[in-house]
Every structure is written in structure tokens, then in C-alpha cells.
Amino acid sequence: MKIYITGLPSGYEVEHLVRLFYPMAPLTLTPPEAGEDCVWAEKKPDGLWAMVRQGGKCAERTAPLPAPAEAGGETPEFSLASLTYDLLRQWTGIRPPWGKMTGERPVRLIHDKRAAGWSETDIDHFFLERFDCSEQKYQMAKAIADLQEPILKVGSAPKTYSLYIGIPFCPSRCSYCSFVSCNLDRDRKMVQPYVDCLCNEVEEIRRQADKAGLTLCSIYIGGGTPTSLSADQLRQLMGTVRQNFDLSKVVEYTVEAGRPDCTDAEKLAVIKEYGATRISINPQTFSDEVLAGIGRKHSAQDILDCYAEARKAGHDDINMDLIAGLPGDTVESFEHSLRQAIALDPENITVHTLTLKRASRIVIEDQRENDYADVAAMLEKCRLLAEAGYRPYYLYRQKNTLQNLENVGWCKPGHEGYYNIYIMEEVQTILSAGAGGSTKLVADGGRRMQRIFNFKYPNEYIQRFAEVLERKKGVADFYDHDLGPEASG
């Protein structure tokens, strides 16, 4: 199946709506050949036209051109995308649960509409009628938006920020992963120079934040796998954080202790000793067969042992990640994983839907067993979380996610992950340290934003570290030029 779009300056919306039904369909710049499977969408001088051809059968739809924007009409691109969506919904018999919504942040959209003065009735119509969103998904997004409102008031206070520190090393590469990460065994010699640079960058971030008059709100050390560092390297990094920031004023300090094959009692003790208030231990699944299939070098029992060690070390706010749709997983085995996680009684459980990343081994080796089979049924099992007292507190979506589904963080009341909410709803500055880091500067109530990027690969980050520090001066410069109500005196 190919996608061909013509007559528009950009076919972005059409392309991504087609991929709700055909996730890996390539976009072609040349007209399909006669009889070739394709979705063809075209804006013609006298109207809109969409056609789908598959297996020798064909269907098409037409519509008039929309009224001009000044007369309240839709853009031609949205109108053509809607026409194509309606055609493919009828052709495939699939109703995407989020309808025509291709954006990553539906909860943010609810916040934005409320801030703009929309009535709840108008927002309901926007989601349910204009975008054909299912009632179930929309009500979940609304409930999350309601829960987030008081938390967002803390995070959106003038000149607050969160600190992200990236550790791009892993003991092995999972088959679903496309992140830039280095194999620990192969690149071990790079780790210490990387940590040294990282500590220097953390110090520079503190200097720039102080100069700009920023107040630290939360800290997140992620990856990669942060616990791929040695215990001494964790002490060095977290010691640098403690020396440079007043942790007593931080509302949350998270460290991903994601994989039990490189997380031991000593590292868990270091993380606790140096001030982390929240950790993440991420099984992804409790099936040994599925773990082996995705490239994990540990067993389900290793996860249970790691969790017990974390509790023994005093960690009282633990998140666990699961992924729906992994190759080899079934509805039954996913339910087993979910019940196992609930039985452990962590404060957070985050349920991701598998996303088909083009650079991941799953896509390269075409291991996509669950494209449209059981993933929705797996997510239906999340009712077990609600029955166990968890509630959804943040939600986001990604392109090429199976069945256009979502990732949802569930928590016990009072254990919402602040950083997760802040980064998804884009209400505050995020200062990022490490390879691949993307600093996002926010001012004037979100009306002014700027990004500062670190070098993507660890070796380049180390070799060009002087440039990394030079770029960080853009933090203070950004706020020096802020002419809005948040300007420093």
C-alpha cells in the first residue's frame, strides 16, 4: 500500500490520517501504476477526491472545495484529510479510537481550549463530532485534564524549570527501541569521560539558571539506562546534582532504574542516599519468552528481586512500565503482566502501546505480530488498574503507534509524576544535560519558546563539549531578552 497526495502544498495531515489505517505505508511522489495498491488523495480545481485501491478492488469519494477560511471554512488540507479518513473508515471497517486526531497531546488540547474560554459543550463537540474521537478515550482525557489542573499551577509558575539528565548507555538494545544509546560492553571506555562532561554541564546549567533567576521544580535522570553507570559513577553524578541544587525545594526527583540486569542493591542505596524521591523499574512484560524475544537479558524473577531490593533500600515511590503489543505477547500474557505489576503494589504503573519506530529491530526485521490483532483488547485490561485504586494522570500519543492508541500513566492518589505532566503539557522550561538533550525554554506564559540542542551521539558530545557549554549560555540570553511579565529585574 502506497500513499499519493497531490494538489496541496503539504499533505502532512492526509499522510498521517492514512497511516491510522496503514501504519507503515510509504509516501510516494509519483502516481501509482495501474492496479497498484494505494490511497490517492487529490485537491482538484473543482473539488476534493480520494480513492483507495487494494487487492484489485477500488472505492472513491468526492467533496466540494471548502469555503474560504475568512468565511469559516476548513483548510483544504483538513477537508481532504477528513474525506480520506471517512473513505478509509468505511473501506477497512476500522474506527480509530482517537478518530482523526493525529496530535500527541490530546490532554493539552483540552487545557488550551479551556484557557481560550471554550465551553465544555463546545469542547465535547470538537472531540466527538469534528474529530470522531470515541467517547471512552475523550472521557479519559477529560478526567486527566481535571486531575492535572492543580499540578500545572505549580509547574507553570513564572520562571520555574525542570532538569533532565540523559544517560545514553544500555546493557543491550531492546528490539522496539530506536533511541540513540550505546552498548555498555562495547562502549564502556566512553562512560567515564561522558560522566565527567555531564557533571560539568550540570554545573553550567546551575550557573545559567541562577543568572536567569530560574527556580528548579523537578529532576529526571533518564536514558538509556541510568543504572548502567557504576555505583561510583552514580555517586559522582548525583553528588554533583546535590552540590549544585537545593533538593529540599524540588517537588520530585526521579531516577530510571529501569533494568534489573544492571541495577543492584548498592546502586539502589546510592540513588536513595543522594536524594531521589522516585524511581522507575520497568519490566515491560513479566513473560520470560517475550523478554527474550525483545532482547532483554534478564528474567521476570530478576524484576521481582530488583523490586524487593528497591523496597528494602527505602524507595517508597516506584513506577513500573509495561508495553502492550510486544511481539509474542498475547492478551492473556499481557493480563498476567498487569496483574503481576498490580500485586507488587507500586505507586505508579505506566502502560505504553508499542510504537513502530523505523530504526527499531521490530520494524527492520518485520516482527509486527500485533498490528491490529489484540492490542486494543490488551488496553481494555487496564480496567484492572482502576479496580485496584489507580487513576490515569497523564497521557500522550506517538506516530505509528499500534491502532493509533495511547500511553497512559496510572498512579495511586497523591503519587502523580510531576515531571511527566510538565513535559507533556509544555508549561515550563526543561533544561537538558547529556547527549541528545533538547533544552526547551518557555517564557511569557508559553507564548515564547526556544530550543537548544546538544549533540546527538555520546562520542560527539564528548569531543565537542566546549560547544555544548557555549550553547548553554543561550539560557540566560533567552531570559535577558524576555520583555514579558516574567522579565528579571
Model-inferred region functions:
Residues 166, 280, 348-352, 421, ...:
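Beta-strand scaffold of nucleotide-dependent catalytic cores
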Residues 35-36, 355, 359-433:
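A C-terminal junction/extension of Radical SAM enzymes
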Residues 181-380:
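Conserved non-cysteine loop/helix-boundary elements of the Radical SAM core domain that shape
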Residues 88-95, 115-163:
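N-terminal [4Fe-4S]-dependent radical SAM core
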Residues 1-108, 112-116, 120, 413-489:
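Radical SAM enzyme core and accessory elements
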Residues 159-195:
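Canonical Radical SAM [4Fe-4S] cluster-binding loop centered on the CxxxCxxC motif
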Residues 50-52, 165, 279-281:
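Short beta-strand motif preference
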Residues 214-215, 219-223, 233, 401-407, ...:
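Amphipathic, soluble alpha/beta structural segments
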